[in-house]
Amino acid sequence: MSSSVVSKPARYHPVSVILHWAVVLLIVAAVMFAGDDGGGNLGLHTLIGGIVLALMVIRFAMRWAVKQPAWASTGNGFLDLIGKLTHFGLYFFTFSILVTGVFLFLNGGQGSFFMGAFHSLSWFAMFLLIALHIGAAFYHQFLVRDNLMGRMWFES
């Protein structure tokens, strides 16, 4: 009887890569079209949010349907924990922004002060986590030198 070892891929599945970068670009666009002061385009902001919601549901399903690369350890337990919490936070706040956005949309922009405030505060938290995520990617790429950024790009 032989036991086979299931290895983890070295990089993310191409569909996961497309979803990741599509969501990045759409989030940038959503921020550009946001604004309560009349400077934004709420219709376009809402449409983009709906597309991001659909892509995030697919992306989340992909995490279970397709093998993921092994966690990229820094060799430091504390930094690895921060990395895991950052990824959890990115998913949590992305979905909280989307869910509160859907609530606000379904109520015609009217409704709970809490939902609007949580939508805005989630954006703020998300910006901080995005900055941390980008900083960590550069840390891995240029200090740890583990080609982490190559995992979230297409094979050359």
Language-model segments: residues:
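Membrane-embedded alpha-helical bundles that constitute the cytochrome b-like, heme-associated redox core
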Residues: 1-156
